[in-house]
Amino acid sequence: MPNLPACGTIGGDEGSSYGGAPDSVGRRKNMRKLTFGLCFGNRGFMPGELILGAREDMVKAVTEAGYDYIMMEESATRYGAVETRSEGLLYHDWLKAHEGQYDGVIFCQPIFVDENGAAAALQDAGVPILMQAYPDEIGKMDFANRRDAYCGKFSVTDVFTQYQIPFTVMKPHVVHPLSPRFAENLRDFAAICRVVNGMKRFNLGCIGARTTAFKTVRFDEIALQKYGITVESFDLSELFQMVAALKDDDEKVLAKIRRLEDYTDFSIVPQPNKITLAKIGCVLDWYIQEYRLDALALRCWNEMETYLRVCPCVLLSELNDRGIPASCEIDICSAITMRAMWLASEKPATVLDWNNNYGDDEDKVVLFHCGPVAQSLMAGKGKVTEHKMFAKGDPGSGWGCNEGRIAAFPMTFSNCQTKDGKIIVYASEGAFTQDEIEDGYFGCAGVAQIPDLQNKLIKLARGGFKHHTSVGMGHMKEVLTEAFTIYLGYDVVDIDN
């Protein structure tokens, strides 16, 4: 029997490339502010004095948005900017010396900058790069003040494309760092950085084998490894053995019971089933710590119900609420998109079935699962019940569904598959509504309104995507698409057009 961690004290962060350490109940949180490396371009015959103002503007913009920064000293080059190839290499080496201290780079173009120094500076940045160019001002278009960054930005992006240096461009084409539009750009770029840095290398736990009935959740483990996703696979019998070895009065088990009772309503769950759920929760925490898992998928039926007399939905719900994406039914691919959305939004994600029509409204759908939805995505506190599907044929075997309703909020839905060695993914947006679902509908569900839903469903069906979709809070399609295509190399299927 391994030495299991105390309840909630899971490690996690050491194994991921990104994600944060747990708090007192194991919620993932960032250990430091997201940090940008600031880089400034120059060109000899342009008004270089404008760069000094840009340094001040950019520092103010970044810090007021709540982020941190690193910046090469002003004395290192003329105005602390890069123009020549040698200056670019100087910045390159400075950035290399600070590797691990920055999450993305903002390349600031106060004027029509020299693209050669820029390419030398950032060709090995290894993180997302945001292209920012200053606008010109009416009334300040004389030679001493004209910037021409509108044009110069194309020279930089042209050469970066030739060098195959990935970069991000946003609307508007030119934008002042102290404007509200750039504050929005910064927020989205920070989300892109979190997704890219968190997805390019991480560990994903596969606890149990795929049940043969669920061929819909097949995946290619070697394809995932090509994208930096390591799958750690465990037999369910090992989990059963560790659960059996735990004593009912073990302090770790008692602490987990307290945590679960505080998390949701356990008032009707028989004590033996509650204890078993707590033991499984302790074992899942051990897997997360021991193998430094950043996300997991669990074989949730029907062995746990038959032999342990529980349904682990509420445990997945609690893990998701902690920022540890946890998918049911060994749906590894859903766990991948759940992690991406958690990184983008910094809020829990969940996996749901495309389950029911909602009356005659063709743009509405009931999204449902038995109970793995994070409590923070629900309209009110859930209630742990017996899974009605299992109770029908084997009463007393399905305790563990966290039942309730999903709150109304803007949402993004996304999922992926592996095919021919590639990760193929889609992302789109909609909203959960306040439409009621009748009381007799079991599990955790919500009504989603999705524009042009019927055409999107046809594209999902033709594309071979599964009956699951991952859902996250907020609209983040553009952030995910940028991260997936420009930096991570996923193949994105556009279901919106």
Predicted features and spans:
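Conserved thiamine diphosphate
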Residues: 157-173
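C-terminal catalytic subdomain
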Residues: 323-436
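Conserved anion/nucleotide-ligand pocket segment
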Residues: 38, 191-219, 363-386
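Extended hydrophobic packing segments that form well-structured cores
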Residues: 394-497
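Metallocofactor- and cofactor-centric catalytic cores in central/energy metabolism, strongly enriched
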Residues: 31-155, 171-193, 205, 210-214, ...
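Short, Lys/Arg-enriched N-terminal segments with co-localized hydrophobic residues
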Residues: 11, 15-30
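Long, internal scaffold/assembly segments composed of regular secondary structure
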Residues: 256-257, 263-344
